[in-house]
Amino acid sequence: NAVDGFENQLATIRKLIEDEDSHALMGLLGHAQAARQHFNHMLAQKPFMENNKVTTQQFTILPGKKSFQGKFSVPGDKSVSHRSIMFGAIAEGTTHVTGFLEGEDALATLQAFRDMGVSIEGPKNGEVTIHGVGVNGLKAPASALYMGNSGTSMRLLSGMLSAQKFDSVMTGDASLSKRPMERIAKPLREMGAQIQTTGERGTPPVSITGNQALQGIHYDLPMASAQVKSGILLAGLWAAGETSVTEPEPTRDHTERMLRAFGYDVKTEGNRISLQGGGKLVGTEIQVPSDISSAAFFMVGAAITEGSDVTLEAVGINSTRTGVIEILKQMGADITVENERIAGGEPIADIRIQGTRTLKGIHMPEDQVPLAIDEFPALFIAAACAEGRTVLTGAAELRVKESDRIQVMADGLKTMGIDCTPTDDGIIIEGKGHSGEWGAIFTGGEIESHHDHRIAMSFSMAGLRTSGEIKIIGTETVATSFPTFTQLSNQAGLAIQVTE
């Protein structure tokens, strides 16, 4: 019971003090502090019903000619931050992470592993130290694991939790509770997992029965999804024999790269990725690169603003993520990639964008869609400022993100005077740009972001080319991926006013 648990914790603290084990003591006290904060956070912000959502923030951007200049470091990559915690937790020994993204989503992952008994120090100024418990060291959480708004956390953890000795339940906020989870549950069941999603649409909460013996699987992904691929591979760490995933097109490969950085052998042959179960991970140093998905807003802002000159420093340019650079280049943007180097197994570079010429409308290449899936809302703003028509196809995945990003972006673009037609798997946007002209493109208006951080940040960049005031409703979720967004945008010259 609770009293026994309290006595056990006191005994643990006494032993750590007697042994002068300061590392473990700091981790335990950090866990206690974080648990209290996390519980308060869940009480305040856990909205299972949309109409219970108490906190709504909005951005206001006034019209007027603006410049867009400066050198910036955007926050750490969210995908790499999630994985650094997950893999550090099940590694043997200590993992030290720098550049960790202290946003809501990555913190949900961190808290989940604290709830499963992992001692984690930080985060403080992007630094996290994880005292790994090994692949068999996770403990049953006392209650449901709360994933907030993070689909990555839930899908990857579905794979890991399916292989544990204990039962578990994962819940999320109102937005995550609408997102499809059967796409990961189905292959895990084929491996022998007992996993249940909720309702006809297979959404969270997700319930997993532990103590199942998993078998390796050879799975052909029906859609390009790095999250589903990663969930299967992570289950494969505990499965008997080989687990392989074949993807229809390449998706981001952070899981494969980071498993190798932790000493786990992962083979990639074309579009087939495989690993053998039963190995171990060894603690390491992870430097998290700046997030190209966050940098994308500044790339687009600079590309649509006359005379702009923006450099984004130490951005991750993993080849499975650089679709946004390729698409902007095809539209005619003045982008240079400088000072390329490797950090923590990931390629990084400085990206410079200058506003020297009007963008051109294009048919966005379908082979770039999985490589730019999170950047399309920002690219739609670029397309509206381009000369001529832009067509996107093959991007049905956008309809099941934090919001239906095709429909929500189309609604907002129409509100601000842009002619566009959403389709089942994309959109057609009639750009209002003219060669050599840099005047207003958007008329302004009130935009409903549907509490989707990428929608809110994308429409913020429209403020660089607007003739009327832009109000964006429901921007509080920007903190999930880019806590310093308004600060950096305003340093560059955008002038966003934030009201709670």
PLM region spans:
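NAD(P)-dinucleotide binding in Rossmann-like oxidoreductases
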Residues: 1-8
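A subset of signal/propeptide-processing and intrinsically disordered low-complexity segments
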Residues: 4, 14-16, 26, 286, ...
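Short helix/strand-capping connector loops at secondary-structure junctions
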Residues: 8-21, 465-473
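C-terminal helix-rich "cap/oligomerization" subdomain common to oxidoreductases
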Residues: 12-51
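Structural preference for solvent-exposed beta-strand-turn elements
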Residues: 49-500
